[in-house]
Amino acid sequence: MATADLTVIGLGNSELDDYAQAAAAEQGRSLRPDAEPEKGFYYRSDHFNFAKQGVPALDPDSGVEYVGKPADWGAKKRDEYTEKDYHKVSDEIKPDWDLTGAVDDAQLLTMIGYRVAQADKYPEWKAGSEFKIKRDEMMKGTSSRSSMP
């Protein structure tokens, strides 16, 4: 099912979010931050190992504003899934799931990847990001790892 939004875990940390914002706008969609940052998803996701090394990485998640559904429908479905299935034996694709919105997400992520690949410079962390220092050191060639004996 298509959404009018896309959740970005850690939204606002890097210039990748600017790429995501532009791509989402072209699709007539918006970005929204993680609704539950206190759960630490940013620090538990696959992209975190890139971030720890100073490499900006995008962590997209499904939106919650489903086209043609009441405003709270997506959040209710997410909560229902988390309670009943998340990390349980039943955590599998269900035959009644409508995955057509995944095409929009895949196209958005492809646009981002293409634009990053065509850009003149690598995406950077934004001021205030805890990973910016590591990236700045890396780009200068003076990271603590490279200076080790």
Language-model regions, residue ranges each:
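His/Asp/Glu-rich mid-to-C-terminal helical/loop segments that flank catalytic regions of hydrolases
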Residues: 64-135, 148
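Amphipathic alpha-helical surface "interface" segments used
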Residues: 40-48, 127-142
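Charged/polar, solvent-exposed surface patches and flexible loops
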Residues: 18, 22, 26, 88, ...
